[in-house]
């Protein structure tokens, strides 16, 4: 199941079924990471530039990927499972929240009204660079759609002259010269990238405080996950006794370690 650590042995085969639950994508993580040459401190693949990963391309049948050596902690996590209520993801059918930005005045009032009242469809042209939507045309003011190129953050809602929203994703360019009406909040971004071509999308307004609150919620979920991971290892593999002097005796796999702790 998801959110679970599984110990694999030589010859084991992992299989996946179709999309189920909250989205169409899942993540398979390897303790120790993948053992491939990093590019700019990353082992990810950027297919457009043909760099990173395995020869800068998508994986294909027959590829062999070496796995790095996991740390001692990860070796003890067989059977560990995170509770599903730890997932901060929002309702997959909820409207996506947009924090409007400085270029909002480049759009007419009618255009902005249409954006937040209309339903859009994700097109088949969507990729890791951007999610292209089709629906009601968003009208610009006399200023037009072109601007002096500026930075494009993750989740920016860019609207070129054709009036169709494009939400910028992980492989987006660093700068662009089209107007951006705003940016999605963190949890709305997570919901968006789980959608498939043909999925319906609606939007609502949000403010900066909501985006900050979502980011804090994600950070708290990560903190709790780490805490539960350590608790699992401590409960299943470690025995410890403590003296009143701040001195610890820690026993791990039969080996005894003397530890002194001082509060600072």
What are the roles of these predicted feature ranges?
Residues 1-264:
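Conserved "landmark" site that anchors the functional core of diverse proteins
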């Amino acid at each position: 199941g998801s959110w679970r650590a599984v110990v694999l042995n030589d010859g084991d085969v992992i299989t996946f079924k179709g999309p189920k639950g909250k989205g169409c994508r899942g993540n398979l993580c390897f303790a120790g990471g993948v053992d491939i040459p990093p590019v700019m401190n990353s082992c990810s693949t950027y297919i457009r530039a043909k760099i990173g990963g395995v020869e800068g391309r998508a994986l294909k049948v027959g590829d062999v990927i070496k796995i790095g050596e996991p740390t001692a902690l990860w070796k003890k996590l067989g059977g560990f499972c995170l509770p599903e209520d730890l997932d901060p993801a929002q309702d997959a059918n909820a409207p996506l929240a947009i924090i409007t930005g400085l270029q909002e005045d480049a759009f007419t009032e009618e255009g902005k009204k249409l954006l937040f009242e209309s339903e859009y469809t994700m097109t088949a042209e969507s990729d890791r660079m951007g999610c292209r939507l089709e629906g009601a045309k968003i009208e610009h003011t006399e200023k037009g759609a072109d601007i002096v190129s500026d930075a494009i953050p993750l989740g920016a809602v860019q609207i070129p002259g054709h009036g169709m929203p494009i939400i910028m994703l992980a492989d987006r360019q660093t700068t662009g010269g089209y107007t951006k009406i705003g940016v999605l909040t963190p949890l709305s971004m997570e919901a968006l990238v789980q959608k498939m071509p043909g999925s319906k999308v609606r939007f609502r307004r949000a403010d900066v405080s909501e985006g900050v609150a979502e980011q804090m919620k994600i950070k708290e979920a990560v903190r709790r996950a780490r805490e539960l991971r350590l608790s699992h290892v401590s409960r299943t593999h470690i025995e410890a006794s403590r003296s009143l002097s701040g001195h610890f005796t820690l026993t791990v796999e039969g080996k005894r370690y003397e530890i002194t702790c001082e509060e600072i």
